[in-house]
Curated annotation (Swiss-Prot):
A GO term for molecular function: 4 iron, 4 sulfur cluster binding
Biological role: Converts 2C-methyl-D-erythritol 2,4-cyclodiphosphate (ME-2,4cPP) into 1-hydroxy-2-methyl-2-(E)-butenyl 4-diphosphate.
Top enzyme class: oxidoreductase
UniProt keyword annotations, A-Z: 4Fe-4S, Iron, Iron-sulfur, Isoprene biosynthesis, Metal-binding, Oxidoreductase
Species whose genome carries this gene: Bradyrhizobium diazoefficiens (strain JCM 10833 / BCRC 13528 / IAM 13628 / NBRC 14792 / USDA 110)
Name the UniProt record assigns to this protein: 4-hydroxy-3-methylbut-2-en-1-yl diphosphate synthase (flavodoxin)
Cofactor names: [4Fe-4S] cluster
Listed pathway(s): Isoprenoid biosynthesis; isopentenyl diphosphate biosynthesis via DXP pathway; isopentenyl diphosphate from 1-deoxy-D-xylulose 5-phosphate: step 5/6
Cofactor note: Binds 1 [4Fe-4S] cluster.
Gene Ontology biological process terms, A to Z: isopentenyl diphosphate biosynthetic process, methylerythritol 4-phosphate pathway; terpenoid biosynthetic process
Residues annotated as binding [4Fe-4S] cluster: 310, 313, 356, 363
Amino acid sequence: MNKLENTIDSDIAGPAPRHRTTQVKVGDVAVGGGAPIVVQSMTNTDTADIDGTIAQVAALARAGSEMVRITVDREEAAAAVPHIRDGLAKRGITTPLIGDFHYIGHKLLAAYPACAEALAKYRINPGNVGFKDKRDTQFADIIEIANKNSKPVRIGANWGSLDQELLTKLMDENAASANPRDVRAVTREAMVQSALLSAARAEELGMPKDRIILSAKVSAVQDLIAVYQDLASRSDYAIHLGLTEAGMGSKGIVASSAALGILLQQGIGDTIRISLTPEPGGDRTREVQVGQELLQTMGFRTFVPLVAACPGCGRTTSTTFQELARSIQDFIRDEMPAWKTKYPGVEELNVAVMGCIVNGPGESKHANIGISLPGTGEAPAAPVFVDGKKFRTLRGPTISDDFKALVIDYIDQRYGQGAKVPVTAAE
C-alpha cells in the first residue's frame, strides 16, 4: 500500500491512485470500484415519526446527500420504514435509505418484511449483532434476509461497541507474547479482524463480495488512519469512511477533515459520512455540506460553485466583502437543486470575492468571475473580472446587488442554453 510520502511528486500534485475495491450498488448509487466517492448522512429523528423523518431525509437529499441512514431500533420504527419510503417517492426523492440495526436487527427484518424490502442497504454492527452462541446465528439470519432481498450490507465495526470476545482473545494472546504490542495497537487489530472475519462469514453464507461494504470507526484521528490503512491493505471490499463521535462545531469538522483527508489522499475510501454533533437548533444538513466541501477542496468531485474570499486584514475594515461572499455562497447553495438541471456543469464555476487591491485583482482573474472590493483608503470602485479579463467597474451603494446580478447573468450565459459568456468593453 502507498504511504503518504510516496504520493508526493515534485511535478504532479494530486492524490494517490484509488485503492481498488469491488463495486457495490446501493439502490442506484455505485460505491467503490472507481465510482465517484459518495457523500452520505444519517437522520437524528425518531424513525417512528414518519412525517418528521420524511422531512429530514428530504432536507438531507436536497442538500446533496446521496444515501441516508435511518435508525431501525424497534418495531414501530421497522413498521414506519415502508411508509417513509413511499412518502419520499411521492416527493420525487429516490435517495437510497440505509437501515441502521443493532442488537435485534435479525428479529425486526424477519418480522417486518416490507421494511427489509424498502431499505436499500442494511448496516450490521458485528460487536452487537449477537453475543456468545447467538452471535453467529443472528448474523446469519440478517445475511439470509439480505440475500433473499438482494440487498447489500455494511459491516461496521465500532471502537465503542467492539466484539468483546474477539478483543479478549487478542489481548490474551498479546499478553502471552514475548514481544507484546501496545494495547491500542491490539484494539485496532481487533477492529480490523472484526470487520474482515464478519465479511468472510457473510461470503460463506452466500453473500457476494459486490454486496459487502466495510467500515471500522474510531473517535481518535491517528487510530482511525491506522485502522483504515490496515483494512485497505488486507482486503478489496468497498470502504465506508467516518470518524465516529467527531464532536460539535469546528472541532468535529477539523477532526473529520484531518482523518478523512489523509486517507482520501492515500486513495482509501469509497463513501464518506461526516459525523457532526449538531449545535442546539442547528441544521442537520451541515454534515452533508462539510462532506461535499472536503471532497471538492481536495479535487475529488465538484458539487457547487466555489466562492473564494480573502480572510481580511487591516486593509479591509469594511465588512462589505464578507457580507457579499456569504450572500453569494448562500444564494448558490439555495439555487443548486434547480441549477443542477437547468445549468449542467455549473458546479465547476469559481467565484472570487476579494477585499482590497493587494491580492484582489490577481485572485479575481483566476476565477471565472471575481470582484475586488475597495479596501481602507482605496478609491470606492470595484473592478469585476470575467474569465481573466476586466469586465467592468462597479461603484456606489449597490455594488453587492450589481455583482450578484452579474454572477447570475454569467451562469445563465455560460451554462444555460446558448452557453456564451458575455464579453463587453471594460467600463
